Amino acid sequence: MGVGPGSPQYLTCIAIDAIKKSKYIIGYKYTLETIESIIDKTRQEVNYVTMQNQESIYQDVYNRMKYGEYCTVPFTGDANFSESEVVDRLLDIFGDDNVEIIPGISSIQVASSRSKIPLDKSHVLSFHVSGDIEKKKKELINAIRENKSVILIPRPWPNDPSKNFMQSDIVKFLKLNGIDCSSLKVWVFEYLTANNIETVFKGRASDLEEMNFNPLSVMIIDQNKRQTYRDFDYHQKKDTKLIDS
């Protein structure tokens, strides 16, 4: 279930209902802090997970659940974006027929709104995966060369920096592939919607090469050209006809 990017204000009513009726709640510390005001620890069992222990906790809760009991696994943002590796494992453990996926407002959506760069005119990528990202890197290059905006989630890998693909790594990769980063406009959002700690950087891609950002960040490569309904022939012809009449 998605619980939004960080602020409880972005939590949906259906998500709140699911949390309240659950006996078991499993999630990462930052995500659980988003919903802590809704959790009742006197009647709900809260399980904090990490990359290392999540498998054993999912299995343990599944084995202890009784018929009619509910378990909620909240994700920051939207459960359908950048969380597929965990969701697919939960489907394996609990079974497709026993799992309901509840969408949430993602940091990608909020970043799109903050920057006024529409999703339907952008290439959206998540590098926040465990597997190979070379194909996604090619998509990134192609999108930039096609003059599309790109909204992306970078990849932090604290235990193995060689697998990092954070903002500075992305810029170095773009330069190696012949992209002029000095003219490329970018945004970086950290801790989106989180009270008092949200940050926004706006500048050129070349500025990012020596900068470090939090893993909870979104990067936008801004090549947006605004286009309204008046830019299309149908509306121009309609306006002309109205004037003539």
Role assignments for model-derived ranges:
Residues M1-I102, V110, D207, L216-I220, ...:
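Class I S-adenosyl-L-methionine
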Residues G2-G6, S126, I153-P156, V188:
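Glycine-rich anion-binding loop/nest that anchors nucleotide
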Residues S7, C13, G77, F81-K148, ...:
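Class I SAM-dependent methyltransferase SAM-binding "motif I" and its flanking Rossmann-like core
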Residues Y24, T72-V73, E100, H123, ...:
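A structural signal for isolated positions on well-ordered beta-strands in alpha/beta enzyme cores
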Residues L32-T34, S106-V110, S130-I133, P158-D160, ...:
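Short gly/pro/ser/thr-enriched loop/turn and capping motifs at secondary-structure boundaries
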Residues T42-E45, K116-D120, R204-A205:
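Short, hinge-like loop/turn segments at secondary-structure boundaries
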Residues V49-M51, I102-G104, F127, F189-Y191:
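Conserved beta-strand termini and adjacent loop/short-helix elements that scaffold enzyme active sites
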Residues E69-C71, I144-S245:
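A contiguous loop/helix-start segment that scaffolds small-molecule binding in enzyme catalytic cores
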